[in-house]
Amino acid sequence: MIAAELDLAKPFIFELPGLLSTDECERWIARIKKLGTDLATINTRTGAQVESLIRNNRRVIIDDSDSAFDLFKRVKDHVPHEIHGGKLVGVNERLRCYEYEPGQRFAPHSDGAFVRNEHEQSWYTFMVYLNDAFEGGETVFFVEPEIVIKPKIGMALFFQHPIIHESSEIKSGVKYALRTDLMYRAYQL
């Protein structure tokens, strides 16, 4: 597969305002509420586990190739087309939809890659904020200098998986976000 290196001196953290309209975000939130959410797990060496000291938000996972393709069409001209011997081929169809209520957060962590097979995997997290009527819930990147992203409805955020970050505690209101990944395939097969 593709060998990766992260240069923390110049991390890739990129905002794309207005990726989704307010109406589109409201439809996503309605879909999340209709499906219902469960306590989110974290991946450990022994498998997926609920670890509420690290992560206490809720989520629902939706496998939706059509929505992933629509998101890809919207972002493909704005994101890196190549990384470490791989070319951009799409957006992961596994859409993780997050719900954070007051007191909920996701402590500092790095995101894992989605590995489809030995030739294709994700390299960047692709987040879309579905609302902004809440206090707290910033995405904080622990780089030098620290970067704090205040969510705005419909805004996309892209960053390299290994960058340590957190979703800070919600003080009031409910935060909704959609997370997926940018997928890359190795040139040399």
What are these model-predicted stretches?
Residues 1-156, 162-189:
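Fe(II)/2-oxoglutarate oxygenase catalytic core
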